[in-house]
Amino acid sequence: MPSAIEAIYIILIAGELTIGIWGNGFIVLVNCXDWLKRRDISLIDIILISLAISRICLLCVISLDGFFMLLFPGTYGNSVLVSIVNVVWTFANNSSLWFTSCLSIFYLLKIANISHPFFFWLKLKINKVMLAILLGSFLISLIISVXKNDDMWYHLFKVSXEENITWEFKVSKIPGTFKQLTLNLGGRVPFILCLISFFLLLFSLVRHTKQIQLHATGFRDPSTEAHMRAIKAVIIFLLLLIVYYPVFLVMTSSALIPQGKLVLMIGDIVTVIFPSSHSFILIMGNSKLREAFLKMLRFVKGFLRRRKPFVP
């Protein structure tokens, strides 16, 4: 029977999983329905659908891993299951980060005005460039996750069953270091790309603001508003990633830390917040998704009001 801490963990993870899958599933459903309706799909919709699907996979594998850890700890002795979880987790995590960086790059190319020939060429070829980046992100995530599947890494973390199931960590320095580098590679580059996008957007905004001040209009134009929305979106992602990434590093190093099981439980709860909460930020930042979300809320509110029993 789960302890009090384990019961709290299960409740929190189940709640976060429900919210996260609902939010990301809503993004996929609305964009796919619009795609079928118009028989056409925009570049931003492709990015959002790819990101939402990767987030759903990430949420599922984190939650399943946590439930297996608590309810069926003996399954960690199954190398096949461990291999599948490791590969899917690595792929979903890396693809989620890379697709988010694609979103930041899209904001940069779509909104920023930078007087450089290469940047101007990227803006002209934005559809081809972004599709190439999306495909490259998928392939990079796939290569990293497949390369991670090696029997030598099973020595990093192993659960052995004696009279009672106990946690036993057997660390091999060389394989562990290599695994750590592989796991973390997928997070550093997207983070750097988002930072670059943020600073270039900020530079473009400052430059645009100076031009507005020269004309002394005194009002914000649509370009300024677009800059501000894009910068806010990138800042929110960076803040969430700053919380998510260190926790992810700790989780991948939990074999080196006493009470590794408790560390993994806390890490699961924190890491699930990132893909769950960011989906609603994306919904409210996109006019089509926001309109569909508010329409759904009005429908639910009206439905609950009609079902409310009459009290004389």
UniProtKB/Swiss-Prot annotation:
InterPro entries: TAS2R
An annotated GO cellular component: plasma membrane
Keyword Ribosomal protein: no
Paired cysteines (S-S): none
The entry's keywords: G-protein coupled receptor, Glycoprotein, Membrane, Receptor, Sensory transduction, Taste, Transducer, Transmembrane, Transmembrane helix
One biological process term in Gene Ontology: detection of chemical stimulus involved in sensory perception of bitter taste
Example GO molecular function: G protein-coupled receptor activity
Coiled coil regions, renumbered to chain: none
Transmembrane region(s): 10-32, 53-72, 87-109, 129-146, 181-203, 235-257, 262-284
Cytoplasmic side: 33-52, 110-128, 204-234, 285-312
Residue positions with a glycan: N164
Membrane topology of this protein: Multi-pass membrane protein
Main location: membrane
Alphabetical list of CDD domains matching this protein: 7tm_TAS2R7-like
Record topological domains on the Extracellular side: 1-9, 73-86, 147-180, 258-261
Compartment annotation: Membrane
Note: Several bitter taste receptors are expressed in a single taste receptor cell.
Purpose: Gustducin-coupled receptor implicated in the perception of bitter compounds in the oral cavity and the gastrointestinal tract. Signals through PLCB2 and the calcium-regulated cation channel TRPM5.
Family membership: Belongs to the G-protein coupled receptor T2R family.
Protein name as catalogued: Taste receptor type 2 member 9
Species this chain originates from: Pan troglodytes
